[in-house]
């Protein structure tokens, strides 16, 4: 009986420890009450930048973009940014957008990204090449950081000249008309 009571007590303590760890671990998973300790990032404290362009043998072109915290305080981002591409006349280009993840963009769920002042979050914008021909090129990209209502505007033209963000011939169902957007990530790894 003493041995059984000790075993039960150890099991109960272990469950309490696991429950406590679970609240810490959930901070990097889904938004929870733990996220209230770090406020959401405001667009006014973020800047949009870009990293490398990648071209895969599969015909996909992708660009890594960055969101940098220029504020004085630590903040967090969680989820997918809103993205739209515009032509040289300022018109939105009629791409189809997906945030669901496909063969080019990871299907792993979003994770909380905590940004100290000066730190960056990363996201990927990917598009299949134009096989039939080119119609118009993107000049600017507009990004709504996750859970914000103000946009950041960046230059998309450098990626067009190297094969990137073109609207394709072939109509709206052409594979080259689909733009894929990853969730924000803390590192550049697989997005």
Model region roles, listed by residue range:
Residues 34-57:
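Low-complexity, acidic Ser/Thr/Pro/Gly-rich terminal tails and inter-domain linkers that flank the onset
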Residues 22-40:
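C-terminal region of N-terminal signal peptides and the immediate post-cleavage residues
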Residues 2-16:
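Bacterial N-terminal signal peptides that target proteins for export
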Residues 129-158:
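Short, surface-exposed ligand- or partner-binding patches at beta-edge/loop junctions that are enriched
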Residues 78-116:
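The feature marks short-to-medium sequence segments in extracytoplasmic or secretory-pathway proteins
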Residues 65-72:
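Asparagine-centered strand-capping/turn motif at beta-strand->loop junctions
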Residues 57-64, 136-138:
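Short, solvent-exposed loop/turn segments enriched in Ser/Thr/Gly
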Residues 151-191:
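Acidic, serine/threonine- and proline-rich intrinsically disordered appendage/tail regions
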């Amino acid at each position: 009986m003493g041995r059984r009571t000790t075993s039960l007590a150890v099991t109960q303590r272990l469950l309490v420890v696991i429950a406590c760890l679970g609240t810490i671990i959930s901070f990097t998973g889904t938004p929870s009450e733990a996220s209230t300790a770090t406020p959401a990032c405001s667009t006014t404290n973020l800047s949009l930048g870009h990293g490398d362009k990648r071209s895969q043998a599969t015909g996909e072109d992708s660009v890594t973009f960055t969101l940098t915290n220029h504020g004085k305080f630590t903040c967090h981002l969680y989820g997918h940014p809103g993205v739209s591409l515009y032509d040289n006349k300022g018109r939105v280009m009629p791409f189809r957008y997906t945030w669901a993840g496909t063969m080019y963009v990871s299907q792993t769920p979003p994770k909380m990204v905590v940004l100290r002042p000066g730190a960056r979050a990363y996201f990927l914008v990917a598009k299949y090449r134009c096989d039939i021909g080119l119609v118009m090129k993107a000049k600017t990209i507009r990004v709504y950081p996750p859970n914000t209502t103000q946009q950041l505007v960046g230059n998309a033209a450098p990626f067009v000249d190297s094969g990137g963000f073109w609207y394709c011939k072939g109509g709206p169902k052409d594979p080259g008309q689909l733009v894929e957007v990853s969730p924000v990530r803390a590192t550049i790894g697989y997005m």
